[in-house]
């Protein structure tokens, strides 16, 4: 028991060292996942020995440990393949090589430079969905890695690899759930892709393509409040250019302006919000001195959150004991979950999650 606890502590200390170093090279990311793989193996062995708690941590079930171990092994092998490619000297962060990004669409590919694509259903500005396309998609095969660009048309999000067009998101799937007319328009940067013939989505061909066209997709992080809006997993959103191919549908050159969102009577997952931007947040509550130390320790994890406040407290608190609060904001809920899964918060600090209008 003591020996296996010591091994787990040693591995987790090395993992924490990698987080604090916050390096952006591929070698460090491979080392990170090797350590995670060792951690999974220790947890699996501990559960086999009938141990339910190890180093004050709950030991996952055998099935959960085995499933995560398989995912980690697959990701590590993909990183090894990437390390043998011309892209090994590029910048690679913890977030870009995270399991969450690896398993997001398109699955089992590395992805960089997320771009927000907004689909407006039924010509209703309050009925929109946000999706994430990627300027750089790294297709991992047995011993090779190929870089392709994520593209968009009226049908959905796709990439072209080896003369094969692969869709990883069809807009008609969500249109069946959220659209009454089964019609929509796609907003990318300052341009809008519409279907001029107004044909139903179930009659749209997903194979016929016209001549390629190019559009400049500017980064428009539009997380404006809507009656229903979802972010699929955006990464850092960069200004970029990428080619866009279309089916029978055309590109409307009218500017998006501010008409795509509404700032009144908005909701965010059932909460009434009247703001142009809603962000996931975490409140860290505890002793002000402890929070000050925690803020310093969290600086190396700046890729895992958007902004962090100074320590503050409620002035209306009559209890006399001024509980400090640090507010951390995130671009997406996925980034927040990655933060909570990665960063070790002391047990004396209370964690509260929610959303905030910014």
Curated annotation (Swiss-Prot):
Give one GO term, molecular function aspect: nucleotide binding
Region ranges (DNA-binding domain): 278-358
What is one GO biological process annotated to this record? viral DNA genome replication
Q: Where is this region: Disordered?
A: 203-238
Q: Where in the cell is it found?
A: Host nucleus
| Positions bearing the Glycyl lysine isopeptide (Lys-Gly) (interchain with G-Cter in SUMO) cross-link | 285
> Where are the compositionally biased (Polar residues) regions?
215-225
From the UniProt entry, list the residue stretches annotated as the region Transactivation domain.
Answer: 1-200
- Superkingdom is Viruses
> Post-translational modification, briefly?
Phosphorylated.
Keywords associated with the record? Activator, DNA replication, DNA-binding, Early protein, Host nucleus, Isopeptide bond, Phosphoprotein, Repressor, Transcription, Transcription regulation, Ubl conjugation
This protein's GO cellular component annotations are: host cell nucleus
Name the job this protein performs. Plays a role in the initiation of viral DNA replication. A dimer of E2 interacts with a dimer of E1 in order to improve specificity of E1 DNA binding activity. Once the complex recognizes and binds DNA at specific sites, the E2 dimer is removed from DNA. E2 also regulates viral transcription through binding to the E2RE response element (5'-ACCNNNNNNGGT-3') present in multiple copies in the regulatory regions of the viral genome. Activates or represses transcription depending on E2RE's position with regards to proximal promoter elements including the TATA-box.
Description of how the protein assembles with itself and partners: Binds DNA as homodimer. Interacts with protein E1; this interaction greatly increases E1 DNA-binding activity. Interacts with protein L1; this interaction enhances E2-dependent replication and transcription activation. Interacts with protein L2; this interaction inhibits E2 transcriptional activity but not DNA replication function E2. Interacts with protein E7; this interaction inhibits E7 oncogenic activity. Interacts with host TAF1; this interaction modulates E2-dependent transcriptional regulation. Interacts with host BRD4; this interaction mediates E2 transcriptional activation function.
User: Family per UniProt?
Assistant: Belongs to the papillomaviridae E2 protein family.
For this protein, the record's HAMAP family field holds: PPV_E2 (MF_04001)
- Its protein name is Regulatory protein E2
Question: Which species is the source of this protein?
Answer: Human papillomavirus 58
């Amino acid at each position: 028991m003591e020996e296996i606890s010591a091994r787990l502590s040693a591995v987790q200390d090395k993992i924490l060292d990698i987080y604090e170093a916050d390096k952006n090279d591929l070698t460090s990311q491979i080392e990170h996942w090797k350590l995670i793989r060792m951690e999974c193996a220790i947890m699996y062995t501990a559960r086999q020995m009938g141990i339910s708690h190890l180093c004050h941590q709950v030991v996952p079930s055998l099935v959960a440990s085995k499933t995560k171990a398989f995912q980690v092994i697959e990701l590590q092998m993909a990183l090894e393949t990437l390390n043998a490619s011309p892209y090994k000297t590029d910048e690679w962060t913890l977030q870009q090589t995270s399991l969450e990004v690896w398993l997001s669409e398109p699955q089992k590919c590395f992805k960089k430079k997320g771009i927000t694509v907004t689909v407006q259903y039924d010509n209703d500005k309050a009925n929109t969905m946000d999706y994430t396309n990627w300027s750089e998609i790294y297709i991992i095969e047995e011993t090779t890695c190929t870089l392709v660009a994520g593209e968009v048309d009226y049908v959905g999000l796709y990439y072209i690899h080896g003369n094969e067009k692969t869709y990883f998101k069809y807009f008609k799937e969500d249109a069946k759930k959220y659209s009454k007319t089964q019609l929509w328009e796609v907003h990318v940067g300052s341009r809008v892709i519409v279907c001029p013939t107004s044909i139903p989505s179930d009659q749209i061909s997903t194979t016929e393509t016209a001549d390629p066209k190019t559009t400049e997709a500017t980064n428009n992080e539009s997380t404006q409040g809507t009656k229903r809006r979802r972010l699929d997993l955006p990464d850092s959103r960069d200004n970029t250019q990428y080619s866009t191919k279309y089916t029978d549908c055309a590109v409307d050159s009218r500017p998006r302006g501010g008409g795509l969102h509404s700032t009144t009577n908005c909701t965010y997952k059932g909460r009434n919000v009247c703001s142009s931007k809603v962000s996931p947040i975490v409140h860290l509550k505890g002793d002000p001195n402890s929070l000050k130390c925690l803020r310093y320790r969290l600086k190396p994890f700046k890729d895992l959150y958007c902004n962090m406040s100074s320590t503050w407290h409620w002035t209306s608190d009559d209890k006399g004991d001024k509980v400090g609060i640090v507010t951390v904001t995130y671009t997406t809920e996925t980034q927040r979950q990655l933060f909570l899964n990665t960063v070790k918060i002391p047990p004396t600090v209370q964690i509260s999650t929610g959303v905030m209008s910014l």
